[in-house]
């Protein structure tokens, strides 16, 4: 096998490969032998059919598999010889495999750009001191009390208000006919949490226990369920009860019930420690980003288009998920797909620059990520998302996501390695 390399750009290579006749014949013979082993034909014993008949019967399959085998073998050889790590799909361009002639084809792919890293040893960076405001701890304790509150009927016969829980029946109608999917009995509704349509909640807030009412139910044009988007219905409501939360005292008994703490002081200590841990991680991450932004301004390099496109896709997926959590859709933005791609592209380019810089730093620092670490990361993702580990790992493998996960882990390790070499000065937090 012979090959020549063309640099189509600083981030794209093309390799022209020529496979000699001898290798072509060997690949075809191997493919024929595989098919011949299990082939049966009248007049011949199984596995004894002449090669020319096997080739004639399964020509398309044999030549296809021989081509694939040759390409796979030579791609691995070329990548090893060039010490190349493609970051894009490898595009194949070649003719048909034929007996008696060399097999010539080309492959093209994108690679990381080559550039000199700036000197980050002793790089000056300021990191804010991690502090915890006791008001934040008090807010956590209040949330715990709220979650453990007892719901008791209000003393007076009044409509519900923000913070109350209303028990009600409701049903929606269109032209006097019930609308399937919009009705419930003894439904518990938290007022003030903005989870219901404004029309619905406003109506409920006018009704005391035992009262009934009806009013318009207007769905926004960007409502996530297209069956109701932009529709105007009528909703009928009957309130059974209005309840208020009776918060338990912030005492040792609450601490024991909430988390098995021996006292309220111990629970406050645990909350404070948790806050301090997350705040320490936050101020470090903020300082690391500031340092990285400064280092990125000291270098310039071209960006592989495939990598930018990948991050554009990720950002659009994130946008779609956020909108869906708000009960909206991408269409609600009123923009064409190409407009949305153009909007997120600058951010995608910045993410790409950051990732490339850190991958180069990882190579310089000798940072590696092994298979056990990747498996551990997938296990963490599975636990956080409530998914099955094996199913999630299969998904990552089938969708070629393992390598991008590995690169993210490499980038994180590289950032830590760079930061360890920085001259970090702790400063007081900025006034809020």
From Swiss-Prot:
InterPro entries: PPIase_dom_sf, Trig_fac, Trigger_fac_C, Trigger_fac_C_sf, Trigger_fac_ribosome-bd_bac, Trigger_fac_ribosome-bd_sf, Trigger_fact/SurA_dom_sf. Residues 163-248 form the PPIase FKBP-type domain. It is found in: Cytoplasm. One of its GO terms (molecular function) is ribosome binding. Disulfide bonds: none annotated. The keyword Cell wall biogenesis/degradation does not apply. Its EC number is 5.2.1.8. NCBIfam families: tig. Belongs to the FKBP-type PPIase family. Tig subfamily. This is Trigger factor. It comes from Nitratidesulfovibrio vulgaris (strain DSM 19637 / Miyazaki F) (Desulfovibrio vulgaris).
């Amino acid at each position: 096998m012979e090959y020549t390399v063309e640099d189509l750009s600083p981030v794209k290579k093309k390799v022209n490969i020529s496979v000699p006749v001898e290798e072509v014949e060997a690949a075809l013979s191997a493919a024929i032998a595989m098919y011949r082993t299990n082939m049966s034909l009248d007049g011949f014993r199984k596995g004894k059919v002449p090669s020319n008949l096997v080739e004639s019967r399964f020509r398309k399959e044999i030549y296809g598999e021989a081509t694939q085998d040759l390409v796979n073998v030579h791609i691995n050889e070329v990548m090893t010889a060039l010490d190349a790590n493609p970051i894009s799909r490898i595009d194949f361009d070649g003719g048909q495999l034929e007996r008696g002639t060399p097999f010539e084809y080309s492959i093209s792919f994108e690679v990381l750009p080559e550039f000199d890293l700036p000197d980050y040893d002793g790089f000056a960076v300021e990191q804010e001191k991690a502090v915890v405001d006791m008001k934040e701890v008090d807010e956590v304790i209040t949330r715990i009390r709220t979650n453990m509150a007892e719901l008791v009927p209000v003393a007076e016969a009044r409509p519900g208000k923000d913070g109350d829980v209303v028990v009600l029946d409701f049903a929606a109608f269109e032209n006097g006919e019930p609308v399937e999917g919009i009705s419930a009995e003894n439904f518990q509704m938290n007022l003030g949490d903005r989870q219901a349509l404004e029309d619905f909640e406003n109506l409920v807030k006018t009704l005391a226990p035992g009262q009934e009412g009806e009013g318009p139910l207007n769905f926004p044009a960007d409502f996530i369920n297209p069956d109701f988007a932009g529709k105007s219905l009528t909703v009928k409501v009957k309130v059974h009860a209005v309840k208020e939360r009776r918060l338990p005292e912030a005492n040792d008994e609450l601490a024991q019930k909430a988390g098995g703490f021996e006292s309220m002081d111990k629970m406050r200590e645990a909350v404070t420690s948790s806050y301090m841990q997350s705040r320490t991680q936050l101020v470090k991450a903020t300082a690391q980003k500031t340092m990285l932004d400064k280092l990125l301004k000291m270098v310039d390099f071209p960006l592989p288009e495939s990598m930018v496109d990948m991050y554009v896709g990720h950002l659009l997926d994130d946008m779609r998920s956020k909108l869906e959590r708000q009960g909206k859709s991408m269409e609600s933005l009123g923009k064409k797909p190409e407009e949305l791609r153009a909007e997120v592209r600058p951010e995608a380019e910045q993410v790409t620059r950051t990732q490339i810089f850190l991958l180069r730093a990882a190579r310089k620092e000798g940072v590696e990520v092994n298979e056990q670490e990747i498996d551990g990361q997938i296990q963490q993702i599975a636990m956080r998302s409530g998914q099955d580990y094996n199913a999630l790992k299969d998904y990552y493998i089938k969708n070629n996501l393992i390598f991008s996960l590995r690169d993210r882990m490499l980038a994180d390790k590289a950032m830590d390695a760079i930061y360890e070499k920085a001259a970090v000065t702790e400063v007081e937090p900025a006034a809020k």
